Structure formats: structure tokens, C-alpha cells
């Protein structure tokens, strides 16, 4: 693995450990160069309660690797999480900088009703 990826994973591990200690439901984000994925994971970490990505049928036709796509994913994961009975989550950025697509997804999820 590259040094950049190793440091990102180290940051992610530290944040996830803290969330595990607090036993909170988390909104986990992963971004690749072409897509962005979001999952709402239970407090024990064993179950995915809701998920959305740019690979979903509703979002696949449009652009998938930009801020507009991340905003749509954030709105979709928030509505699915609320349908599953989740209203409060901890934001797990997976070691990525809180900037650009990650920030757009988080802001859209907040506007759609999720509390961080």
C-alpha cells in the first residue's frame, strides 16, 4: 500500500475505535475516483441499516464522481436511514479530508434530516 493510503487507514482506524467505544450508529463514507458510497452501520458494527451509492439505479445515469452526485447520495442515504428508524449518527469520513465530495455528502444528509 502507498504511504498516502496507509495514513488514511490509520486515521480511519482511530476514529472508528472512538465510535465503537461510544457505541453510536455511524454514517460511513468511502470515495473512489469514480463513485462515492455511504452506509449507515449499527452501533455494534455488525449490520448495515441503510446504504446508498452512485451505483444505485436512481443515480447511475447521471454523473457519478462529482459533488452533485455526492449530494444526491447524501440525500438518499438520509431518507433510507430515517425509514429504517435512525435519526442520529456519527459521521465516519474513513480518513478522507472533510472537503469536496465528502463534505457535500455530509451536508446533504444533514439537510435531509440526519443529526450528526
From Swiss-Prot:
Any one annotated GO CC term: cytosolic large ribosomal subunit
Taxonomy, superkingdom: Bacteria
GO biological process: translation
Membrane-traversing stretches: none
InterPro entries for the chain: Ribosomal_uL18_bac-type, Ribosomal_uL18_bac/euk
Protein's UniProt keywords contain Repressor: no
The keyword Disulfide bond is annotated on this UniProt entry: no
Keywords attached to this entry: Ribonucleoprotein, Ribosomal protein, RNA-binding, rRNA-binding
Gene3D superfamilies assigned to the protein according to its UniProt record, in alphabetical order: 3.30.420.100
Function: This is one of the proteins that bind and probably mediate the attachment of the 5S RNA into the large ribosomal subunit, where it forms part of the central protuberance.
Family: Belongs to the universal ribosomal protein uL18 family.
Complexes and interactors: Part of the 50S ribosomal subunit; part of the 5S rRNA/L5/L18/L25 subcomplex. Contacts the 5S and 23S rRNAs.
Protein name from the UniProt record: Large ribosomal subunit protein uL18
Gene: rplR
Amino acid at each position: 500500500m502507498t504511504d498516502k493510503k496507509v495514513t488514511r487507514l490509520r486515521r480511519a482506524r482511530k476514529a472508528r475505535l472512538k465510535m465503537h467505544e461510544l457505541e453510536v450508529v455511524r454514517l460511513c463514507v468511502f470515495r473512489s475516483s469514480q463513485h462515492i458510497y455511504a452506509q449507515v452501520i449499527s452501533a455494534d458494527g455488525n449490520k448495515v441499516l441503510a446504504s446508498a451509492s452512485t451505483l444505485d439505479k436512481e443515480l447511475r445515469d447521471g454523473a457519478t464522481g462529482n459533488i452533485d452526485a455526492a449530494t444526491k447520495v447524501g440525500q438518499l442515504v438520509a431518507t433510507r436511514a430515517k425509514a429504517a428508524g435512525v435519526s442520529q449518527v456519527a459521521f465516519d469520513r474513513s480518513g478522507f479530508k472533510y472537503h469536496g465530495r465528502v463534505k457535500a455528502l455530509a451536508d446533504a444528509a444533514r439537510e435531509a434530516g440526519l443529526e450528526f
